[in-house]
Amino acid sequence: KLGVPQPEGGYATSQKEAIEVAKRIGFPVLVRPSYVLGGRAMEIVYDEMDLERYMKEAVRVSHEHPILIDDFLEAASEIDVDAVCDQKDVIIGAIMEHIEEAGVHSGDSACVIPPQSLSPEVLDQVRDYTRKIALALRVKGLINIQMAEKGGKVYVLEANPRSSRTIPFVSKAVGIPLAKIAAKVIVGHSLKSLGYMDEPKPKHVSIKEVLLPFDKLPGADPVLGPEMKSTGEVMGIDYDFGRAYYKAELAADNVLPLTGKVFLSIRNADKTELVDVAKKLQAAGLELMGTEGTVNYLAQHGVFMDVVKKVHDGSPNVIDMMRRDEVNLIINTPTSKQSRRDGSRIRRAAVDFKVPYITTMQAAIAAAAAIETMKKGEELTIKSINEYHKEMEEENKV
């Protein structure tokens, strides 16, 4: 009706029907029970065998409890929008670009205001779809819309006519009390009468980072996916992405090292993007090491580093080095079953030995940018949130 693109999808009430729907859409697909919170029992499945396992182990499907099956947009950038609508006008509080790609639960992904890599054309699509959806739903108050961008095209994943968990972050980032505005709209005020008609345009960069509880969960693998695992959030603000991201990681107690050793063990799908990350880390003076496959790949692209044994090949390996406090950062994105077992042990050891760790390539790219900025001698801005808001107010008066 609105002409807003969304990923192809369907639902199933039996295993046979689920396989038929998935084949029609094409793997990989995102599967979940028909009503879940926090991504509970949500999973990305890559083939028919994986789907059969999910149907048997993860959910009980029936006519009363169907499962939803959607096309999974691989390598897409996920976007969150928080807005207020009074059934006539719509004000966008902020467009948030997720650091992690689509596939990591929105509650577990770091995100940035304003977006750093989305084109003006994509942002215009996001604004257009937000207004169309909010007005068509006759929303009176807050609405949160999740979208994904792939190849310059924006898809709407879901629209929730309610407050979202990002409202406190957005309000602090842009200096506008969205919940208060929405409450006044609900009781009859218009956005125009309240003086809020324009989308805020902050000059500073705000990063939301999550707090993960794995240090309280012995043995749990700290890997991110469609099921939400975080239990809190922190925020970093500065005048560029690098410093804001560094502050956010500092607040999350995942302090990015400016000296020392970095261990790399990356799945094949991520290796193309790894080259630039490795070059930035090496140029920043960090010493790199990794497993044989990663080391050989980077050597072909002019980045040379030390080889460390895989965990299943025996000692000395990276876990031994963490135990001796010889590793300052772990970057690990596993894929195969053996690598997954090794990766799980490495990530768990990083939590246990309190070594900063990264499990997605997008977070590695962000971390490399932050380290590069800090190594250039950039000073962290020490300023209250009120001072950032005052600067925005003064700019808007001009």
UniProtKB/Swiss-Prot annotation:
Keyword tRNA-binding: no
Record text on cofactor binding: Binds 4 Mg(2+) or Mn(2+) ions per subunit.
Catalytic activity: hydrogencarbonate + L-glutamine + 2 ATP + H2O = carbamoyl phosphate + L-glutamate + 2 ADP + phosphate + 2 H(+)
Keywords: Amino-acid biosynthesis, Arginine biosynthesis, ATP-binding, Ligase, Magnesium, Manganese, Metal-binding, Nucleotide-binding, Pyrimidine biosynthesis, Repeat
Listed pathway(s): Amino-acid biosynthesis; L-arginine biosynthesis; carbamoyl phosphate from bicarbonate: step 1/1; Pyrimidine metabolism; UMP biosynthesis via de novo pathway; (S)-dihydroorotate from bicarbonate: step 1/3
Residues that hold Mn(2+) 1 according to the record: Q146, E158
Xref: Pfam families: CPSase_L_D2, MGS
MGS-like domain boundaries: 254-395
Family designation: Belongs to the CarB family.
GO molecular function: ATP binding; carbamoyl-phosphate synthase (ammonia) activity; carbamoyl-phosphate synthase (glutamine-hydrolyzing) activity; metal ion binding
Protein name: Carbamoyl phosphate synthase large chain
Binding, ATP: R32, D71, L73, E78, G103, V104, H105, S106, Q146, E158
Transmembrane segments: none
Highest taxon listed in the record's lineage: Archaea
InterPro entries reported for this sequence: ATP-grasp, CbamoylP_synth_lsu-like_ATP-bd, CbamoylP_synth_lsu_CPSase_dom, MGS-like_dom, MGS-like_dom_sf, MGS_CPS_CarB
Domain comment (free text): The large subunit is composed of 2 ATP-grasp domains that are involved in binding the 2 ATP molecules needed for carbamoyl phosphate synthesis. The N-terminal ATP-grasp domain (referred to as the carboxyphosphate synthetic component) catalyzes the ATP-dependent phosphorylation of hydrogencarbonate to carboxyphosphate and the subsequent nucleophilic attack by ammonia to form a carbamate intermediate.
SUPFAM superfamilies the record matches: Glutathione synthetase ATP-binding domain-like, Methylglyoxal synthase-like
Quaternary structure and partners: Composed of two chains; the small (or glutamine) chain promotes the hydrolysis of glutamine to ammonia, which is used by the large (or ammonia) chain to synthesize carbamoyl phosphate. Tetramer of heterodimers (alpha,beta)4.
Gene3D superfamilies cross-referenced by the UniProt entry: ATP-grasp fold, B domain, Methylglyoxal synthase-like domain
Organism field: Methanosarcina barkeri
Region (Carbamoyl phosphate synthetic domain): 1-255
